[in-house]
Amino acid sequence: PPRARWNEGWDENVKDKETGEIKLVHHPALKHVKENVGTQLNKALEAIEDANVDALQDVLKGINFNRKIGQRTLDDDTLADFVLNFEKIPLKDDDFEFPDLLGSAYEWLIKFFADSAGKKAGEFYTPAEVVRICVEICDPKEDMSIYDPTAGSGGMLIQTRDYLREHGGDPGELSLNGQEKIGTTWSICKMNMLLHGISHADIR
């Protein structure tokens, strides 16, 4: 969507509050934004979600770059540097060593924050080794429907997919379903699924 474009600026018709006249306002490309960066990033995420409702509904709009961290919000310079650093990282599919690289990086971050959170991590994270044992016990097959009533960050469902693929099965023939009552954890789970290339999972 135009509002989320990285390299291209975009134009918007805006109504003047005082005169009522319609004016054409030019917005810079996202990587060139220097003022109100947090607000522009929030709007970019909203635009991406609105353009991909089936996959991203309620996933990105909860992210707020203007939220206080400790006693302050991140300033424009910090956020602008954060945005520009993304340009230094090759993020095209062809640049990845393996298809699930982004998903693996995301899971590493989940584990990192889980280790830092201590007991609170139990709300969204189960160690991968424990999950693997559970999956092996279940021994999923094609045409099965898998349901995780406490999905957390989605590790069980992802490892179920991986297990089937490792054993020569077609993950597309597996029905993945999960439930999570904590909103932020649900968003983490949805994003984890998408970054692992799983768009057909039903997470509620």
Give each language-model segment a name.
Residues 1-142, 204:
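Non-catalytic, mostly N-terminal accessory regions of nucleic-acid modification and defense proteins
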Residues 120-204:
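Conserved S-adenosyl-L-methionine
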